[in-house]
Amino acid sequence: MRILAVEDEPEYLEMLQEVMNSLGHTIVIAPNGKEGLAVLESQTIDVVVSDVKMPEMSGVEFHRRVREHPEHRNTPFIFLTGVDDLTEVRAACKTDSDLLLQKPFPIDKLLKMFSGKMK
């Protein structure tokens, strides 16, 4: 599985890389939504994991732009967030392909999301 991780916090990127690589997945990293969109246009991606609060473009805006592409309308998308007010993120989660994981999170919860929803 090819996973796009759009995250500006190095510790979460490192953790995602470690866990996904150990499971045999390939992880592609983008530090912001703008670069994430460029990756989606140039590579095949099976799952998107994105922070909500990022520079240049919020995760919610990034999600909206991803969903504008017909080939990514149903690509599994996991929001990672440390914000307390989840109203905007929950409003963006419109399909079964959209998931939310609040930081900090236990690794087993992330693994459960991947094993259950991402097959």
Residue locations for each model-derived region?
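Conserved acidic carboxylate
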Residues: 7
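Helix N-cap/capping motif at the beta->alpha junctions
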Residues: 29-38, 59
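Active-site beta3 strand of CheY-like receiver
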Residues: 44-49
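Receiver (REC) domain active-site loop signature in two-component systems and cognate sites
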Residues: 54
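Alpha4 helix (beta4-alpha4-beta5 surface) of REC/receiver domains from two-component response regulators
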Residues: 61, 84-101, 108-112
